[in-house]
UniProtKB/Swiss-Prot annotation:
Primary location class: cytoplasm
Gene transcribed to yield this protein: CAP1
Protein name: F-actin-capping protein subunit alpha
Complexes and interactors: Heterodimer of an alpha and a beta subunit.
Known role: F-actin-capping proteins bind in a Ca(2+)-independent manner to the fast growing ends of actin filaments (barbed end) thereby blocking the exchange of subunits at these ends. Unlike other capping proteins (such as gelsolin and severin), these proteins do not sever actin filaments.
GO BP, one annotated term: actin cytoskeleton organization
Length: 266
């Protein structure tokens, strides 16, 4: 019993630490290591929980999240296309679509908001972009996800922002996660919150707020990264020995004394 609880915790922790765009690889590795049917169920449960909590993009368009999860089934609601869909965790695709009429009231500006968010993504997100809107009368929530997945050059990145509009006010948070793993393993995480008041609840006002907020967040990321690079990384470099030569951490590590000792187990 205790070993089963321990396994659940370990699997959940590994899945939770998954870098952007690499969840399928982690899923395959865990499934290969934990080959029994019960353990496979443990992996799938951990992945479903991760997706519900953090949101995921399927078929490059559809977002699955706890905020658009259908209450009485395993499916998710696409409020824009008015459909239910399931997800294939391993192929990262949306499947098993069916027509659905949500039992919520849509704001009058909903269609215009869809149009403006589409244009916003085309203008500001250079790679994969998806969004979903969850209406509830005059209130609504928006999730925006931008991904840049460059496996050939060993880096993946994800931007996710979540906004809540209620009674003329808007609050949101953005998370940035970048993973670089060529001859090393570097991870950059950034989180920032924002809030404000809308002079009027319409599509233009909402998207303008999102645009301004995300521009400010982007500038803050650049400033924080420059400070990290110029201050902390620079101080770290001063603690390292000056060899006046580039260390090839891959092929030539054995040529250095420390590397030779490691290679030959001295």
């Amino acid at each position: 019993m205790s070993s089963s609880v321990g396994l659940d915790t370990i699997v959940s922790s590994l899945v939770k630490s998954s870098p952007p765009g690499e969840l399928d690889g982690i899923s395959q590795d865990l499934s290969a290591i934990l080959s029994s049917k019960s353990n496979s169920s443990t992996v799938n449960t951990a992945i479903e929980k991760y997706i519900n909590e953090n949101s995921g993009v399927f078929s490059s368009t559809y977002i699955a999240s706890k905020i658009n999860k259908h209450e009485s089934s395993t499916k998710y609601i696409d409020f824009i296309g008015k459909k239910l869909f399931n997800i294939d965790l391993h192929k990262q695709t949306a499947i098993d679509f069916e027509d659905y009429e949500p039992e919520v009231k849509y704001p009058a500006y909903f269609d215009e908001l869809v149009k403006k968010l589409t244009e916003y993504g085309e203008d500001h997100y250079p790679s994969k972009y998806a969004f979903t809107i969850v209406p509830d009368g005059s209130d609504l929530q928006i999730i925006i996800i931008g991904q840049k997945l460059n496996y050939e050059n060993f880096y993946t990145g994800l931007w996710k922002s979540h906004y809540k509009i209620k009674s003329g006010s808007i609050e949101g948070e953005a998370k940035l996660d970048i993973h670089y793993y060529e001859d090393g393993n570097v991870r950059l995480n950034f989180e920032e919150s924002t809030s404000g008041t809308l002079s009027s609840s319409n599509a233009s006002e909402i998207v303008n707020f999102i645009n301004n907020a995300e521009n400010e967040m982007t500038l803050k990321i650049v400033e924080d990264f420059n400070e990290l690079n110029q201050k902390y990384f620079k101080n770290l470099r001063r603690l390292l020995p000056v060899t006046r030569s580039k260390i090839n951490w891959g092929q030539a590590i054995g040529n250095y004394r420390l590397g030779s000792d490691v290679v030959h187990n001295k």
